[in-house]
A protein has these predicted regions:
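FIC/Doc superfamily catalytic core
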Residues: 1-28, 36-228, 232-295
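Double-stranded DNA-binding cores of transcription factors and transposases
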Residues: 32
Length: 295
């Protein structure tokens, strides 16, 4: 029995073009060609892709660093509090800026301290405060090791989406489009079953936490379950799961937003998870380095 290039691409999570290249390079045992079509054995294994060895090596480094971090003395309560305060300001600034919030890093810090910025929208103030509250809520979930669920996701969105009370923590009921994106979010009637499937797939996955979360994040944003606030909610979910697994939270920088956007397109157009995986791995690695340098 054979499968087509398209079937192999879907099975292995790569692009049709990449499958054809692997066929032409003789990297798939038993493959044959009939005219312009490739016939691939149904039981063929996905060939190793040397292009992603760098990411695989980085994951190994990350695992070693995490093991080393776990073996060192824990931070004191005061140290943790100080580091969290600093992280929350930058994280709130970057995550909101990616979505169009106009507050600068300094202004975000001031707003989170209870000040009001003249000539800046109330919405921007509320987004900053809501994001901070959502992150501290996520920390509480981590302490209690609360399993990821639709209820948890809706609670986080409720805090994030502070400026639109009627839409907080509620799945959207209208169709939406993401400007400039190469993927169209699902129709409203599909949100519930898609979210259930996403969570089932995530729970049953045996992948390393980083590619596992890279895939979850892209799929979550692709479903786009809420009318707005999906990006901020999605990035908080990534940090919820990273911290539950014993890793430090990451902060995707506003300055890296183009690479971040491109990682979504790479997955939706070419079925290539590598770009998002590499982005996440790089951030986790940097955070581990900063923690190890302190201990």
């Amino acid at each position: 029995m054979y499968m087509t290039v398209k079937q192999a691409a879907e099975k292995w999570g790569i692009s049709d073009r990449r499958v054809r290249i692997l066929c032409s390079e003789g990297k798939i045992p038993g493959v044959t060609r009939e005219g312009r079509s490739w016939k691939i054995p149904e039981d063929a294994k996905k060939p190793e892709d040397g292009r992603y060895k760098t990411t695989e090596n980085l994951l190994e480094k990350i695992d070693r660093k995490k093991t080393e971090l776990d073996s060192r003395r824990p931070l004191t309560e005061g140290e943790v509090e100080r580091l969290t305060e600093e992280f929350v300001v930058e994280y709130t600034y970057n995550s909101n800026a990616i979505e169009g919030n106009t507050l600068t890093l300094r202004e975000t810090d001031m707003v989170l301290r209870g000040l009001t910025i003249d000539k800046k929208p109330l919405k921007d103030h509320m987004e900053a405060v809501g994001h901070k509250e959502a992150f501290y809520f996520v920390q509480d979930l981590v302490k209690e090791q609360v399993p990821l669920s639709e209820s948890v996701i809706k609670q986080i969105h409720y805090l994030v989406f502070a400026d639109k009370k009627d839409d907080r923590g509620v799945y959207r009921r209208v169709s939406v489009r993401i400007m400039g994106a190469k993927h169209e979010p699902v129709q409203p009637y599909l949100i519930q079953p898609k979210m259930e499937q996403l969570l089932d797939d995530y729970r049953n996955s045996t992948e390393h936490i980083i590619p596992r979360l890279a895939r979850f994040h892209i799929e979550f944003e692709g479903i786009h379950p809420f009318i707005d606030g999906n990006g901020r909610t999605g990035r908080l979910l990534v940090n919820l799961e990273l911290m539950k697994a014993g890793y430090p939270p990451i902060d995707i920088k506003f300055t890296d937003r183009i690479a971040y956007y491109n990682a979504f397109d790479e997955y939706h157009v070419k079925h290539n998870l590598g770009a998002m995986e590499k982005l996440f791995a790089g951030y986790v690695n940097e955070r581990l380095d900063s923690y190890l340098a302190m201990l």
